Structure formats: C-alpha cells, structure tokens
Amino acid sequence: MMFTPLIVLTLLVLATAEHQCGPNEQWSDCPGCELQCGESDKPCPAMCGDPKCYCSPDQYRRIPDGRCIRKIQCPQH
C-alpha cells in the first residue's frame, strides 16, 4: 500500500514530461500540418497527425535544426 503514492507520483511526472515542448512549440493530441521554411505552399490534408509538439501557429519549422522561428527568419532559398 505504501508504494501506491510513489507509483502515482512517478506516472504523473512521466506524463507531464512527455508534453514539454521547446521554444515556440505547443503540444497537440491532434496536430494538423506544420509550416516549414520553404514549404509554405505545400498542400495540407484536413486530418490529425500523431500527437506531438509542433510549432505555434505563427511559427515555421526550420530545417535542419528543427527550431520554430518566425517566417521572416527563414533562410532564403
């Protein structure tokens, strides 16, 4: 019986850690398409992707380092 609070606490910490996102990112259980530098015209199907951290709505994913940045900060191709 003494292990129950410890197990609950451990599960809570693990669940919280999974949803910590990087700068300019947010967690979504049902993310749509994520904007990427240089691919702003790419079509986006209206369906859920896998749950994950994705760039905030006004941010673009910079490749290759994966940071989320404003569109104006995207490298020019």
Curated annotation (Swiss-Prot):
GO terms for molecular function: serine-type endopeptidase inhibitor activity. Keywords: Disulfide bond, Protease inhibitor, Secreted, Serine protease inhibitor, Signal. The record marks 46-47 as: Reactive bond. GO terms for cellular component: extracellular region. It is found in: Secreted. The keyword Signal applies. Disulfide bonds join 21-53, 30-48, 33-44, 37-74, 55-68. Residues 21-74 form the TIL domain. Residues 1-17 form the signal peptide. InterPro entries: Ser_inhib-like_sf. This is Serine protease inhibitor 1. The keyword Disulfide bond applies. Defends the organism against the host's proteinases. It comes from Anisakis simplex (Herring worm).
